[in-house]
Design a protein with these regions (language model features):
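Surface-exposed assembly/interface segments
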Residues: 1-342
């Protein structure tokens, strides 16, 4: 202890209380097994998975796809494996798993049954999470309407995406795609045109591709000598990455404002107080722009405190704050005109 420390002793305490932040990089494998008693376990590599599951188990096969994409994409920092009991429905199992561990963002379920997939899609639609499935149903590339894609497309299932692949039962293409793309920062990547490891290429006619697109399926084919996924959309026809960006914005705005509320003695119902909330909104939008999620030129409108309804002021409810931003999106098609002369 220095001489000055003997005279003046100072204790510094970090006053800011952190809040839990939602992760958008962690997939969940939901499967029926008896390998462990707890409802969920977290794994950070295949070595851990291999210690609990045989190579013939569905969980092992799915995890291999999730962790096996380092050469063509990113790798999840961890995965959650959730257990389904034999007497549970898939939705009951999902609810129980989510109660035990809700840190995951995208679901991969070890079932190819269309009724199970529809039920899981309906359940996911009520949460800020997404679900990736695959099917080898021969009806999918036709004009038939009994396959899972036709069913979910009719529902505009905007939190579920699906892959048609004749070898879906063995290849788990949705898991490979998730493993390659989920770990990128939301807003920085488009899921279209992406390569993966360990997935058999489909050979599809132009008619089959058209039928699949009519139902908002994705598929894995060879284009220009490269094997790629197309089209990177949910069953409502909107891009997968767009839904992820929307969920990211919702979570980060909520977390940022909550952080400021719990780490302030109070935020006064005054114009300077409203400016504190505005600053939190601007911080998140600035990060969204840096991530490539939104274009520059966004704006935030903050109300004057006297324009807020007196009843809301009495309830200590501030607003309405309004921000406007354009999603940056991505380029998927290019039109070009060239004029040559001699």
């Amino acid at each position: 202890m220095s001489d000055l420390d003997q005279i003046i002793r100072i204790t510094l305490t970090r006053a800011s209380q952190p809040v839990a932040t939602a992760s958008f990089q962690i997939p969940l494998i939901l499967a029926s097994f008896t390998n462990f008693e707890e409802r969920t376990r977290v794994y950070t590599d295949m070595q851990g998975v291999a210690a609990d599951f045989d190579s013939t188990d569905g969980v092992y096969k799915i995890a291999t796809k999730l962790f096996g994409q380092s050469g063509v994409g990113a790798v999840p920092p961890s995965i959650v494996v959730g257990r389904k009991d034999a007497l549970e429905s898939w939705v009951e199992a999902l609810d129980a798993v989510n109660e035990d561990n809700s840190t995951w963002y995208v679901l991969v379920a070890d079932t190819k049954d269309a009724a199970d997939q529809e039920a899981l899609s309906d359940a996911i639609s009520a949460n800020r999470k997404i679900y990736g499935l695959s099917t080898a149903d021969a009806v999918a590339p036709t004009t038939g309407t009994t396959d899972i894609g036709a069913i979910l497309s009719a529902k505009s299932a905007g939190r579920t995406f699906g892959v048609y692949l004749p070898t879906a039962a063995e290849d788990y293409p949705e898991a490979a795609w998730i493993g390659a793309q989920l770990s990128y920062t939301p807003g920085s990547n488009d899921w279209d045109f992406k390569r993966v490891n360990g997935v058999t290429v489909s050979k599809l006619s132009a008619t089959a591709k058209n039928n699949l697109r009519e139902k908002n399926y994705n598929f894995y084919t060879e284009v220009g000598g490269v094997n790629i996924f197309q089209d990177g959309n949910m069953f409502d026809g909107l891009p997968i990455d767009e839904q992820i960006v929307i969920d990211w914005l919702y979570a980060r705005l909520q977390e940022s404002i909550y952080f400021r509320l719990i780490n302030s003695l109070k935020i006064p119902m005054t114009n300077p107080g409203l400016a504190i909330i505005e600053n939190e909104i601007r911080t998140v939008l600035s990060q969204a722009e840096a991530n490539g999620a939104i274009d520059r030129g966004w704006s935030v409108s903050t109300p004057d405190v006297l324009s807020i309804d007196p009843n809301l002021r009495a309830q200590r409810t501030a607003g309405v704050f309004v921000f406007r931003a354009r999603l940056a999106g991505s380029i998927r098609r290019v039109n070009l005109e060239g004029y040559l002369s001699v």
